[in-house]
């Protein structure tokens, strides 16, 4: 069954699951190499782990721009294919490539000229500043690897080929995991480079994944091809990409702002609290990768059938998507509740971190189901061409309510009660996202 027939005719449940499983696996592997980075860096020192946690907010901002642009492009391509306009899809894909290259150049310039300045803003301690600068400058200067990798993967996803998208991610992730201990600790004749080695291993993995994804598109993508000959740039393509992409960028950037602000709040508590939050955020991201894989699989299904005016299949996707995500999130809650100490020990947690982190993981994990519903509602509405619901839901759960509630609770009752801020933020965001997405669905499917 070809890509068009699969998106139009295959029963929704097996279609969603067969597309989602490769994406889940690839995203889990991608998240795993972030965790492996932290595990190896933690063996250097808690200071090195704190530096990696502080830099993560800036990395996340960079990734936000790439992922947001790619999500907008993915939604546009799926609709064009559903409308049976392959030439317009190819033109949009070419425009998307230029946008990715331009954006990566901007971040590379930031890495070359502003890494020192950013490091001084992230930390006051001179040792922390130096470690932050080492890790950050390499990731920014060579960011074109992650931008091209994200772009090429979304072209594959737009035509329903999540298996090759998965393989490209796995290639980069496995290479990163192999290179991490070699470059950090100086194995096999390689000089020990510490935090700098972790950053180099990361960008090499990203570049390898980008090359693989681009080659897969060149030889295995049956519909979408980048065509420079007779290419005509159209601002309408840019507008269509960022109609969904800009809210997604803002949504992702909110996560970056949140981690930066929360780290500043937690620095007033202790450096251990900052290191713990960095660990939690990567563990939580690992859990949410299956949720994100499910949501990313839904975008081309919803976008194609919306473009094809097959609204019944859009409704079926909605009815299957949310319960599946809730079950996955519930499994994560059980794991975090039952094994918090074991999870923290993966990162060589000190006794102080265990004392702080075990109750924190248990408290926060209660909100995972609500978080999953918010995320999936955002992906679903993005597939319908509405990125605002995604953006506002993310703003509520990660910034508007979480940050002030966390600050207030810590000031009033201490750090042990601060984690309850996650409950308030996730409940309100879940209610908003479900209501608005369901309302959008009813409007479209009248």
Predicted feature residues:
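Short alpha-helical transmembrane segments in multi-pass integral membrane proteins
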Residues: 1-20, 77-144, 190-246, 302-367, ...
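Helix-terminus/linker motif at the lipid-water interface of multi-pass membrane proteins
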Residues: 28, 32-50, 119-126, 182-193, ...
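Hydrophobic transmembrane alpha-helices of multi-pass small-molecule transporters
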Residues: 61-64, 176-181, 210-214, 286-289, ...
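Small-residue-rich hydrophobic transmembrane alpha-helices
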Residues: 49-109, 146-165, 276-338, 371-393
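Interfacial/gating helices of multi-pass transporter permease domains
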Residues: 18, 41-60, 127-131, 195-196, ...
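N-terminal transmembrane alpha-helices
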Residues: 7-39, 43-44, 60-72, 76, ...
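Short runs within selected transmembrane alpha-helices of multi-pass transporters and secretion channels
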Residues: 70, 139-157, 165-173, 198-213, ...
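Transmembrane helical elements of multi-pass membrane transporters/channels
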Residues: 18-37, 138, 149, 172, ...
